[in-house]
Swiss-Prot record:
Species, as recorded: Rhodopseudomonas palustris (strain BisB5)
Assigned keywords, A-Z: DNA-directed RNA polymerase, Magnesium, Metal-binding, Nucleotidyltransferase, Transcription, Transferase, Zinc
Enzyme class: transferase
Residues annotated as binding Zn(2+) 1: 71, 73, 86, 89
GO cellular component: DNA-directed RNA polymerase complex
Gene3D superfamilies: 1.10.132.30, 1.10.150.390, 1.10.1790.20, 1.10.40.90, 2.40.40.20, 2.40.50.100, RNA polymerase II, clamp domain, RNA polymerase Rpb1, domain 3
Binding site residues for Zn(2+) 2: 810, 884, 891, 894
Family: Belongs to the RNA polymerase beta' chain family.
Name of the protein described by the UniProt record: DNA-directed RNA polymerase subunit beta'
Record bears the keyword Zinc: yes
Cofactor(s) required, per the database record: Mg(2+); Zn(2+)
Function per UniProt: DNA-dependent RNA polymerase catalyzes the transcription of DNA into RNA using the four ribonucleoside triphosphates as substrates.
InterPro entries reported for this sequence: DNA-dir_RpoC_beta_prime, DNA-dir_RpoC_beta_prime_bact, RNA_pol_asu, RNA_pol_N, RNA_pol_Rpb1_1, RNA_pol_Rpb1_3, RNA_pol_Rpb1_3_sf, RNA_pol_Rpb1_4
EC numbers on record: 2.7.7.6
Amino acid sequence: MNQEIMNLFNPTTPAQVFDQIRISIASPEKILSWSYGEIKKPETINYRTFKPERDGLFCARIFGPIKDYECLCGKYKRMKYKGIICEKCSVEVTLSRVRRERMGHIELAAPVAHIWFLKSLPSRIGQLLDMTLKDLERILYFEYYVVLEPGLTDLKERQLLSEEEYLRAQDQYGQDSFTAMIGAEAIRELLKGLELEKIDAQLRVEMAETDSDIKHKKLAKRLKIVEAFRYSGNKPEWMILTVVPVIPPDLRPLVPLDGGRFATSDLNDLYRRVINRNNRLKRLMELRAPDIIIRNEKRMLQEAVDALFDNGRRGRVITGANKRPLKSLADMLKGKQGRFRQNLLGKRVDYSGRSVIVVGPELKLHQCGLPKKMALELFKPFIYSRLDAKGLSTTVKQAKKLVEKERPEVWDILDEVIREHPVLLNRAPTLHRLGIQAFEPVLIEGKAIQLHPLVCAAFNADFDGDQMAVHVPLSLEAQLEARVLMMSTNNILHPANGQPIIVPSQDIVLGLYYLSILREGLPGEGKVFGDLAELEHALHAKVIHLHTKIKYRWDSLDDEGKPYKRLIETTAGRILLGQVLPKSVKLPYETINKLMTKREISSVIDQVYRHCGQKETVIFCDRIMALGFFNAFKAGISFGKDDMVVPASKWKIVDTTRTLAKDFEQQYNDGLITHGEKYNKVVDAWSKATEEIAKEMMKEISAVRKNASGAESQVNSIYMMAHSGARGSPAQMRQLAGMRGLMAKPSGEIIETPIISNFKEGLSVLEYFNSTHGARKGLADTALKTANSGYLTRRLVDVAQDCIITQDDCGTSLGIKMRAIIDAGTVVASLGSRILGRTAGEDVRDPQTNEVIVKKGELMEERDIEAIHQAGVQEVKIRSALTCELVNGICGKCYGRDLARGTPVNHGEAVGVIAAQSIGEPGTQLTMRTFHIGGAAQINEQSVIESNFEGKVVIKNKAIARNGENHNVAMVRNMVVAIVDPDGTERATHRIQYGARMHVDEGDTIKRGHRIAEWDPYSRPVLTEVEGTIDFEDLIEDQSISETLDESTGIAKRIVIDWRSTRGGADLRPAIVIKGKDGKVLKLARGGDARYMLSVDAILSVDVGAKVKPGDILARISTESAKTRDITGGLPRVAELFEARKPKDAAIIAEIAGTIRFGRDYKNKRRISIEPMDKEEEAREYLIPKGKHIHLQDGDIVEKGDFIVEGNPAPHDILAIKGIEELAAYLVNEIQEVYRLQGVLINDKHIEVIVRQMLQKVEITDQGETDMISGEQIDKIEFDQLNVKARDEGKKIATGTPVLLGITKASLQTRSFFSAASFQETTRVLTEAAVNGKVDPLEGLKENVIVGRLIPAGTGASMAKIREVAMKRDRMILDEREKQATIVPPAAPEAEPLALPPAE
């Protein structure tokens, strides 16, 4: 008996240790082996006694007792009868929880098809039998017969026969001469009769013979599914069910409510329908009912089973009593409320509470204020145990009473319990890992949680009613992790970019800014102070002001770290600030001897962290916070109406622009410019005016004014707030005191009339109305984008969740080359910022001296970056996640520095999830920030290039002509102007637009800011290369060209119209030709005629017979009017790039280098071919829709990768033509562009990690002698494994090309079916996995969370490692023992005990 009691506390089912999970189709035998009995009746429970009916859906005989250790009739009660089966009610006496584990089954009277294998596309049954889904459904739902065995008749196997045809055939051929069946039995027979090996061989032969691409694809698909069945051990006929499993009753509960009603799971209703129909069918079959009735019943049974498995997948949705669709088994798994996402990936947490947050400026960085009431509730178990240990209570009940009465000793104990016990604070939405941090609680009165101001940025919290949740880590390990990994003091840097995230904001910044202002001419200027006491005395006595320029003897450290004093010129405020700076050689007084804006403060914190370590940084942050708050309060900065200074020159600028706009209107009326050009010019003029007014306003607001005594007066408050970075921006100041400027319509177009007033002057009614567009659009956008951004983050996390650092170094020699990113001549991302914290892929050498700055394989730190910058290195090869050669995960060297710690990355760091959060988090931030600048339009169309460096001009691919107006014009598209140092180093390169006016020539020496070229941003020209007379070809009135009169001006302009849509215009090829004096078409220098093809919407600029010179404009194509760009263009753009979608009007890229030739047109497409330079290559042809403007002419030379038709390139094309490195560079730059526009910093490596995950698959081009199928996509790892196997067997290996998958697709095709199923399309993923008998190796994070294990990252990774080592040791010991056991000495005499091997 005692043993029994002991066993009670042992878990009955031992937790199995497993490393993989396999899924396959359940055979009828398997289903029966799970089952504890057949369910024969649809009854559930007896409504009077509430006891389950026998053989019903809740039967206790099958599923187990309802109460622990008690049979149904009550004959056997208590533990002592454990395991006995009651002879009266046949219930086993055991724990009631077996009702959660035991399954039953329903024996079907007729087989039914499993709807998942039938309807989830592509239909598996259909593919195997090579039949269409429509035909299958006709057979299954009893409309058509199918011929199984034609015998000697003219019928074909698998031919469908309708009822009449079947009867006719029976009459014609006799009843037994052929076999035809109907319903699931027929399909089952067909599946049973399949000879998979034969089909496999046959398909391979057919694939080798076929030329059609579509047929090849179709055969490959079928072959794949045949192979799946061959190798997985599944049998095709198992897709037809003869037995339906019934899940345990406690997983589909029936709960009596008061008033005699019941709450029940929908599954019970669905099961009842199946049982009812099945029983009715059995009865009808026993009664030998007419065929038509039985057939109808069978069809209804099929439908009932369909609804049970997946309600609504076929036919109408079955609804319950309240017209609500019933939740079937598939719905239990699917979607946000399904099993996967609701219960397995996220669980409710015990020991948590939530409350409103308020600011706690007197807290230290590692503390948070916890209301006493809350702490008492959260730490109850700890308090109970402490009360017990101290002997204050003997039972839990007593302890409970003490706590409820809130006795004084309870509070003392609470203090003890809470001491150094960290708690986790979380603010929803948790967009990145800094949304949950650990703090040490400090007990406070009141009911609100107090939060430290410096961590608000990480939580994105403010105190306007935000709430936060508190969680208590219970176990010692959890407390340790909270303290070591999650403590707010350990999260000083942002994981996305390595910048400090514990940065003062708002009041603190304002206070520090005020503290560090220096003003000339204040009383006491030039006084010298020796120590702090003296200075403070002078301040209190008002002899000097905080901002007075003084001299002070400062304690400095020399290079050896020895203290010495030196005299510095500074202000009293900055001395006070200097007192909190940690003493270090690397942090001289100059670090803070300047005006402290938010950016400066951030850089100081960064330096302190780098040079003095974490502890000093935390202390420093707390001190400057206190200093900032104190000085903001002392300064008492506020602003009044007069602080908004409207510039005097405002109206002058407005009037000038008004006249300009009138001029453009007039030009338009005279027909000199089109409506679109007028619109663009007007909008341009007004945005320039707005900028100018804003400049003037800034000049006046920030101007230093002197008062009567010659001292500088106080700085303007508004300017102080904006300039310090505390609140507001120049854009907002412009709206307050400049002019509001242009507004956008909801469609994104800009309204031509600007808002001239500002908020100080007040808006007129019309202006106010115009500005409501922007504000409303902002709010609507915000609501929509939050959801979009969350979804983007979810997809990113899903695709990258199994990316973990698993080794230190993979030893690869591959890498990617990094250069500074220069956009329109300005450096947007310096080389240093891009390679900081990355590993050098090869030695970085000084270009002048050739000495090594950084060795290959070393991490580049700040000092190395400085050296690289000094040496003028332009390009560095670095290791990257993209080129890492590890099979699982990424190596530390390829990843580089852990941005959140500033040290090399640790083993087990989940870099994939960090990357996903770093990219996703600002998405939400940005979308939430659209409405801060009320839709004020910002257009930046760039139309000039100015030099940022001085040097000599070198022009590559030079082709310049002097046109009729005596301007130099760029005549080619690939002309590049480079600015070169005297020592030959390229400082900058600029690609020149076609048709741009050149302001420099080869060999010129230019200064900084010199204009290199300019062009019209609103149209693209077609230029002539030769001098001659104009003639038109195929430019026929109303067929290919139309004179349009502008309604408002009455001036005609000639536009090329779409000639294909006019009658008789299909074969036209509109062009302008240039003829010589003899009337013949001139030849061009590069070969070909001087014939310029025109595209739709080209506006002609010349007439027949006009004389032109090289570089003159023949026609122009206007570009679209400018739309406002904000992150709305941004977020969808990022999603589009990550999803690797083909852009709407994708660019066409040259696959080879060669010469352009125009071929014969095909239907309504232009044919262009490239004659390759390399004679080995084949020529490539492209068909281009005629409306598209092709800016190349016959005979132009293109390089591989050049654009033939402008547009956004499709990422797949870049990968195919230029390779992985170019693709990565393109994606990284494009995505960074969007974030840069918003001023968000994200490290490139995060994007690289995601792109690596998108490149996991290979498309097989040649299958060699392997089992792979050409054209199929297969995992890189699997591809390599199969090739290694083939090479070992001496067979020809397969070849493949890398494929780029969008993140959704990549997530659904991961090696783990658990991860894919819990992401999207659960049914499809599980169906496919089951057919293939897939094994989930449980390598990623999601799969392990789902099966309830520690994740293989972070501390979980080290646990796994330890476990692995232990298992290895165990194995070695066991092997050793076995060895010793085999060498037993010969049997000794009886008397002696046997010599045993020594115990290990």
